[in-house]
Amino acid sequence: MFWFKNVMIYRLTSPLSLESSSLEEQLRQTKFSPCSQSDISKFGWSSPLSGSELLHFSQGKQFLLVSHKEDKLLPTNVIKKETEERIAVLEEKEARKLKKTEKQAIKDDVVAMLLPRAFSKHQFTAIWLDLDAQLVYVDAGSSKRAEDTLALLRKTLGSLPVVPISFALLPSEVMTNWIAKGHTPNWLSLLEEAELKSFDTDSVIRCKRQDLESEEIAQHLQAGKFVTKLAIDWENHFSCVLNEDATLSRVKFADEVREKNDDILKEDIAQRFDADFLLMTEELKLFTQKMIEEFGGIKERI
């Protein structure tokens, strides 16, 4: 099961509905295929469930997809060295300086020569569509990685009107008040890690193994710094770092959660996957609702 380790949430700005069979047909048009000897990169959809040929997994209006990106690893220093050597030999032979286009052609030849021997890097990115709430969750630690997968889905579906979720209250201000005013919600506890930022001076303070209720932290907040990252624990559910853009990083589900389906035999991969997906999505749905409440509701963009 693709237990999310990072969470980036997007809101659909126009209603989206999907039907399993037609979605599968669309996904097959952009199915992942491995790099050939001449390819430097490939990007497409892979099956979320090991051993299944389906390119999506669904439960009612919940859909899970997994993008698969393969990049050939070509060391830039090797390409540069080989290219420069070839250029030097040709310039000496012809007693002239090569044009920019000629140098690029030589570089392209070097890349083509190295590609068949290059190692591959594979990257899988899970994306969950909660069409009941019209929200999209991406397991990505960077906006670029999330946007790449969303762009692939947009290409697959023909349209995907989404924006990053935003709230009536700024998460950084709310998190700052949790610490400065002792307004931490009773359903979560603060861990000893945070990032404080001054938007006037761009100064940044990163705290680890630090009592966030200490006088030292209080002084930083009184001086005008805001909390931009905060490690939190939702007891018996999961811990994570909550960021100022409401994304979650380093999500770690509690053992109590991950072990709930241990009564299902390991050999029954499909049933365990189904149960774990339901479990994970219910946890994240509940947390999202709590975030919406704490941050004053979803802000509808014009």
UniProtKB/Swiss-Prot annotation:
The keyword Hydrolase does not apply. It comes from Actinobacillus pleuropneumoniae serotype 7 (strain AP76). May be involved in recombination. GO terms for biological process: DNA recombination; regulation of DNA recombination. The keyword Cytoplasm applies. PANTHER family: RECOMBINATION-ASSOCIATED PROTEIN RDGC. InterPro entries: RdgC. GO terms for cellular component: bacterial nucleoid; cytoplasm. Belongs to the RdgC family. Keywords: Cytoplasm, DNA recombination. One of its GO terms (molecular function) is double-stranded DNA binding. It is found in: Cytoplasm, Nucleoid. It comes from the Bacteria. This is Recombination-associated protein RdgC.
